[in-house]
Amino acid sequence: MTRSLLLAFSALALFSLNAAAQNIRAGIIGLDTSHVTAFTEILNDPSSKGHVPGARVVAGFKGGSPDIESSWSRVDGYTKTLQDKYGVTIYDSIEEVCRNVDAVLIESVDGRPHLAQARLVIAARKPLYIDKPVGGTLADAREIFRLAAE
């Protein structure tokens, strides 16, 4: 996971025009997976094994899917950890997250909302990392890549 995160943030640092490479403010969309706490720990905690310097998670949007138990049953717990342990600010919309960050990670466990989430991030012209799955369908994934290429 550390290598994939390092690669993602190396790419974000190279392409981000809004932030110095050592001060990237990251936002996370979809706080219903253990990946959000794992990524936040290695970005925000210098004492963490595998710490990746140069970026900090500073903002989040809960998201979640009401029809997937592994989503709705975990989102509040992961959100609380991000707030209490790492001081992450939770916003009520993806647009608010985008206004307060330099780059975004979409982490929602459910791939179905990824296209709608990515549309907002791409429209805000923020570098974007999408965790698996890229989209809910192959057509969604293709559309995400098409939008990102524009």
Residue ranges and their predicted role:
Residues M1-L7:
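Bacterial N-terminal signal peptides that target proteins for export
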Residues L5, S47, L138:
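Solvent-exposed, flexible loop/coil residues
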Residues A8, L14, A21-A124:
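N-terminal glycine-/serine-/threonine-rich beta1-alpha1-beta2 phosphate-ribose binding loop
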Residues A103, V109, L115-E150:
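Beta-strand-loop-alpha-helix segment that lines the small-molecule cofactor/substrate pocket
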